[in-house]
Amino acid sequence: MLRRQARERREYLYRKAQELQDSQLQQKRQIIKQALAQGKPLPKELAEDESLQKDFRYDQSLKESEEADDLQVDDEYAATSGIMDPRIIVTTSRDPSTRLSQFAKEIKLLFPNAVRLNRGNYVMPNLVDACKKSGTTDLVVLHEHRGVPTSLTISHFPHGPTAQFSLHNVVMRHDIINAGNQSEVNPHLIFDNFTTALGKRVVCILKHLFNAGPKKDSERVITFANRGDFISVRQHVYVRTREGVEIAEVGPRFEMRLFELRLGTLENKDADVEWQLRRFIRTANKKDYL
């Protein structure tokens, strides 16, 4: 069993490396194509690459849609997307406060097929191993600082990725006036202003936490709105009336900011870092990554 998992992991990493290499090559060819169309000089590293320019003329027959498909290197969800519903476990750090436990309950209600697990004395490798054996697709771990939720980690099984978000301005359901009852039907999802490749990667991670398929009778809406790399999460219910549509917020309400994306699972500290927020760079606060 362990040998098979190790072999599958090696095969997956090799396939992922090949796809990333092809994606980088395709991006370089796209830069050459744009430079030729606009009459701009090529960057020095591309101008000196003779093999890249030699093969460029054979790429002119590629359609834009095919080029876009070549850049889609994220196949972690391909095996189960739209075929089976996600199975999610929500847990916390050790010895959680009352407020963090309450927030974990509300996050559990946010996802239709989620189960909340008391952390107890579980160490992370044993917890991940138990999730894999039980057929869990995603693990959500919440952390806090002095009773205030500070981070949310999403790890997909069996091979990753693992996305870590910082939490800001957390408002729980019981802090919202007239929040109403929590609906547990499959929600409609709204993803707003995710324009970059990294943004679409984050959308792929978040949307696969929910069930696929039509939701005609659902009156529940969850919104993920990107504003300056801060993802605002809001949950509403709506009711159709004679005068139109009335909406009400049911919570919880918080902002997330991505600060690290790894290719492996949560217990794998040696996994490759796909993206990491580097605040010490001068342009870190001026550039939008999502």
Curated annotation (Swiss-Prot):
Q: Which Gene3D superfamilies match?
A: Probable brix-domain ribosomal biogenesis protein
Question: Which subcellular locations apply to this protein?
Answer: Nucleus, Nucleolus
The principal localisation class reads: nucleus
Q: Domain of life here?
A: Eukaryota
Annotated GO biological processes are: maturation of SSU-rRNA; ribosomal small subunit biogenesis; rRNA processing
Please provide the record's keywords in A-Z order.
Answer: Nucleus, Ribonucleoprotein, Ribosome biogenesis, rRNA processing
Q: Outline the extent of the Brix domain.
A: 86-267
Q: Which InterPro entries match?
A: Brix, IMP4/RPF1
Task: Answer whether the UniProt record assigns the keyword rRNA processing to this protein.
Answer: yes
Tell me a Gene Ontology molecular-function term this record carries.
single-stranded telomeric DNA binding
Which Pfam families does the entry mention?
Brix
- PANTHER family xref list: U3 SMALL NUCLEOLAR RIBONUCLEOPROTEIN PROTEIN IMP4
Q: What does this protein do?
A: Required for the early cleavages at sites A0, A1 and A2 during 18S ribosomal pre-RNA processing.
Instruction: Name it.
Output: U3 small nucleolar ribonucleoprotein protein IMP4
Q: Which gene encodes it?
A: IMP4
